[in-house]
Structure formats: C-alpha cells, structure tokens
A protein has these predicted regions:
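Ferredoxin-reductase
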Residues: 1-46
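FNR/FR-type flavoprotein reductase catalytic core
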Residues: 34-165
Length: 165
C-alpha cells in the first residue's frame, strides 16, 4: 500500500522486483481516481510519502505438473511473479488472461516469456477470443489434466464465482 501526498492510502500489487537493483519494484496501477492519477503522474526519482508491504501470504510454489493461472484486469499483476516461479520450478504453465477489451490486457509479453501457453479472452472480442476468463479455463480443463489452478482478479464477480465452482 502507498499513500500519495494528500491522497488516500491505496493497495498496490507488486508485479516484480529486481534484487540486483536495491529497492526496485514494479507496480501496476490502473488510473481510476485522484490518488491513482497522481501516482501515474510521478516521474522516476519522485517521492511517494508512505509505502507499506509486501502484505499477505506468499503463494506456495512447487512442481505440481500442469498449472493454470487465470486472471483479468489488474488482477494479472500479482500473477506475473507467481507464473515465473511456477515455470522455474519445472511446471507446465498455462496462463489465461482476460479483459474487457484489447487495451485492458496487461503484461502479455511477460506472461508469454514464462508460460508454455497463453490464452487471451476479451469481452468484446477485440483481441484473442471473445468470452470470459472462465471460458478459457474450461477449454484447458476439457482437453488436458490440470494439477493446480490459480485465479486472480480483478475480473467480473460472476467469473470469480464460476472459477471457484
């Protein structure tokens, strides 16, 4: 989480870090309100008043076999280091990325570099296949054995419920 000067505290997801560059992290921010807009206006070397984290639980990584990682929107950001770690552990990684349209598909290049297969789904069909993230996941489950399934949001509420079923 970070606090921009005269802005609210907002949770942010670390999409990567570089241990060779002390203190360097990669954040993904969707510009939707005052604080996120101010954050997006910062330049390299600018100051952020307060940064707290990382927060939460680390994802357990081991060699599972075939792993499907599915997410949409900014929910894809926390998936990236996990996909990279799963691949490094020797898994076959299939990534399903989703967004409302082509412009909202993020980190595709980076996901392709660490995945055996990437399936793109867009609500409007402007890129990849038209449909929800769940349809991409169902395609994989129908054709092959999946040993582990990981899902990340933000995606539609109904998609999260379907992925949980």
């Amino acid at each position: 989480a970070c606090r921009c000067k005269k802005g609210e505290r907002m949770p942010l997801t670390i999409a990567g870090s570089d241990p060779r560059k002390k203190g360097t992290i990669t954040l993904v921010v969707q510009e939707v309100g005052l604080s996120s807009t101010r954050l997006c206006e910062l330049n390299e070397g600018d100051y952020i008043t307060d940064v707290v984290g990382p927060l939460g639980q680390a994802t357990h990584i081991e060699k599972f076999g075939t792993v499907v990682c599915a997410g949409g929107g900014v929910g894809v950001a926390p998936m990236l280091p996990i996909v990279q770690a799963l691949k490094a552990a020797g898994n076959r990684v299939i990534t399903v990325l989703a967004g409302r349209n082509k412009d909202l598909i993020i980190l595709e290049k980076e996901m392709r570099e660490s995945s055996d297969e990437v399936i793109i789904m867009t609500d409007d069909g402007s890129y990849g296949r038209k449909g929800l993230v769940t349809e991409g996941v169902e395609e994989v489950i129908k054709r092959e054995k999946v040993d582990k399934m990981l899902r990340y949001r933000s995606c539609h509420h109904d998609e999260v419920r379907l992925l949980a079923d």
